[in-house]
């Protein structure tokens, strides 16, 4: 495992490094079958700015502690593509996937009140996150378009400022704690443990996503 990745490194090494980096690459719509091509070659073939790609990769890889070179020019279209695809992945794939398996797992719960509470908590969180990302789609991505055109960007609305003052992954941590402390079942617990693993993945994903937006887009 490398501490950081460079343009001359092989893309297949990056993809095989960790699940987190695999997810990052998928959000640039990069197909597999990369052979022995370098990161720069693969990015160029897929019309992705290599420098911006590496900033996001290394930022994620470091857990948000990566300080990219100050002379790095961030390509706004590449950044926008990554953020938009992250929204789609979370709202259309990962969270619905977790909910389906959550319902299956909770069917064997010994406490119907806890089952109801967990599903209700999850659904409320999904709606909150959906609203959060809808606001971002309108304001954050509009800011990216304005920046790319060289326009002076408008002041952030109170709504977008408000949703970026509290970590969006915090409630997922609360949901994990509810399941860990109060969920009981007489059946196989493999499914609920798998759900917890996916909640950890989602929590980290949202943490990095929020950090990237705050780093590049929130003054």
Model-derived features: where do they sit?
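Small-residue-biased structural context
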Residues: 1-219
